[in-house]
Amino acid sequence: MTVHDKAHDLGYALRNSAEYQAFLSAKQHLDNDAPGKAMVQDFFKKKLIAEYDLMAGNPEDKEKSQELQKMYEVIVLNPTARDFIHAHMRFQQVAADIYKIIGDAVAEGMDLFGKE
C-alpha cells in the first residue's frame, strides 16, 4: 500500500469520524440560524485577525482579547452557535493531532530552516 493510499484512507476515516459528522450536523443547524451564524462568523473573523497579529510578532492586544471573550460569552448563550463552536473545536483538535503525528514522523531532515 502506498503513502497516497494511506492518505486516502485517512481522508475517508476523517470524513466518517464522529467529530467531523458532529461538525457537519452543527454547521447545518447553524446555517438555519442567521443571527447565530453572523455571530460565529464575526467571532472567527476577529479571532483570526488577532491570531495573525500574534504570528506577525505583535504583542497581544488586551482590548481585542477582552472583546473576543465577551463575544464568546454571548455566543454560548445561543445553543446553535455554541454547539457549532464546540464541534469546530473538537474537530480542529483531531486535525491538530494528525498534523502533529505526521510532523513527528517526518521531523528528521525538516530542520533546514531551523534556528542555528
Spans of model-derived segments:
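Terminal, compositionally biased segments used for targeting/anchoring and flexible tails
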Residues: 1-116
